[in-house]
Amino acid sequence: MGGFEEAGSWVIVTMMWVGAFGGIMSKMKAFAPLSTLVMKLAKNVRQLMFMNGILCLAGNAALADEMAQIVTVGPITKELVENNVEGSEEDLYQLRLRNATFSSALGVFGSQLIPWHVYIGFYLGILSAVYPLHQFVAMDIIKYNVMAFIVVGSLLLLTLTGLDRFVPTFALPKEPKVKLKKKENLSENRSKKLA
């Protein structure tokens, strides 16, 4: 086999490995120190959500694959919100939607800004096959990907600054409606889970 014929032969096996990796790391609580660090840094819900976005982007860069980021970092951001934020079910749903948006959008569009990401490698391979007269590098693709810069930048900045309220149906619930659980409540919840 050669060329386009063998292009996807390894994808299913890789996705199974990535899914297993995310599940195993979650069961081992391997990322608990990372969650603890995020909670120490976050002073309010908006900062927590911004840090969830940064986690998604950092996970995408570290793992160099958007699906690996979704199955590995996705459960971390989900647990951060579920275990540390209190509010009405409707408001918590808004936070869950933002986490899903971070996982998806920062996975796909964030990958377009990471030079060592598998997407960029894939595109470079196609470009080199189609036009072999030029030696393409990752920055040839990244510097013209204005949409990725806008999506990643606006998602993070609108979340952090609160300017997301100007985008219809995109605003996060404000602080009195949702708030971080007090540290005493968190230690009680953890001791109940352990018992």
Model regions and ranges:
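Membrane-interfacial segments
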Residues: 25-33, 38, 42, 67, ...
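Juxtamembrane helix-boundary/capping and inter-helix hinge elements in multi-pass membrane proteins
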Residues: 27-31, 42-45, 79-99, 126-138, ...
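Juxtamembrane and boundary regions of transmembrane helices in multi-pass small-molecule transporters
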Residues: 110-195
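Cytoplasmic juxtamembrane regions at transmembrane-helix boundaries
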Residues: 27-48, 133, 177-188, 192
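Alpha-helical transmembrane segments of multi-pass membrane proteins
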Residues: 15, 47-60, 86-113, 133-150
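Hydrophobic alpha-helical transmembrane segments of multi-pass integral membrane proteins
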Residues: 15-18, 38-80, 103-104
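Re-entrant/interfacial helical elements at transmembrane boundaries that shape
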Residues: 36, 67-82, 114-131
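Core transmembrane alpha-helical segments of multi-pass membrane transporters/permeases
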Residues: 1-32, 53, 57-58, 62
